[in-house]
Amino acid sequence: MRIAVDAMGGDHAPAEIVKGALRSIEQFDIEVILVGQPERIKEFLPQGEVPARVRIKEATEVVEMDEHPAQAVRRKKDSSIVVATRLVKEGEADALVSAGSTGAQMAASLLGLGRIKGIDRPAIVTVLPTLEGGKLLLDVGANPDAKPEHLLQYAMMGSIYAESILGIQNPKVGLLNIGTEETKGNELTQATYPLLQKAPLNFIGNVEGRAIPYGQAADVVVCEGFVGNVVLKTTEGLAGALFQLIKEKITATPLRKLGALAIKPGLKEIAKMMDYAEYGGAPLLGVNGISIISHGSSNEKAIFNAIRVAKECVESGFIEEIKKELPRFTAAQE
């Protein structure tokens, strides 16, 4: 198995990207193709030598975060994200991972890999930590102006991903809304609800945002990209602020510091559970290839886990499963 990694994408590229890639070949039986500028990549390789099961593919350009994604992808044919995507398209790699511009990765994936036939818009799916383990939320940013049929497709892809990757049998699918009643919501959610009811899914109805952290209502929560991105970033910010507040309060006095020692192991476990780096990357579902989007501030651990996610996606064959199941969903709507 070969994973193409955009070595030039991200706030800490190429250092943390290369470190994460090297860690992945120690843990997994894979080959990593580091795509980018060879002289910069080699600075972070042991003794500047390319180890076994690592290959460097030269790309002379980089799409910067402040560039217009689609325009940059079309203009910079030799950028690291375009070259990495091309490797997947041409069969030289089985998946790609990037912590660079999300918009550029989406554009490169759509232009280079194309959409799965029958999927109108791709969706970014992420795993959210909950009291019941990891649950899926999609879309978290690919398509901020979705239509009801798009949300139906997201629900189908999310359900297959939950079964294939998370091992959840017959996953419960919920529609993110402002209330649990069927009549709640805006035009989009009200039009989507009957489509999900009719679909061959384990649809449990509307889910409120406050139910997501508990993880009991649904295994897959579906929404348009604008709302999903707000939920994701609010969750990240709230988790960070909460841990900062806890740290300040439990170390405020000498007596509290003593008590903090007793609960430190538990706090470490919670911090690990809430750490985005543990979850690695978010797959772009709906494109005809495996494209894993990593956080722009990804460190070594996050890149390692993004490569792990890419490996699991390849092994699961979930893209072929989507292609196989799509006609059944289409027929149910006729």
Swiss-Prot record:
It is found in: Cytoplasm. One of its GO terms (cellular component) is cytoplasm. Keywords: Cytoplasm, Lipid biosynthesis, Lipid metabolism, Phospholipid biosynthesis, Phospholipid metabolism, Transferase. It catalyses: a fatty acyl-[ACP] + phosphate = an acyl phosphate + holo-[ACP]. GO terms for molecular function: phosphate:acyl-[acyl carrier protein] acyltransferase activity. Transmembrane segments: none annotated. Its EC number is 2.3.1.274. It comes from the Bacteria. GO terms for biological process: fatty acid biosynthetic process; phospholipid biosynthetic process. Gene3D superfamilies: Isopropylmalate Dehydrogenase. Catalyzes the reversible formation of acyl-phosphate (acyl-PO(4)) from acyl-[acyl-carrier-protein] (acyl-ACP). This enzyme utilizes acyl-ACP as fatty acyl donor, but not acyl-CoA. This is Phosphate acyltransferase. The lineage of its organism: Bacteria, Bacillati, Bacillota, Clostridia, Eubacteriales.
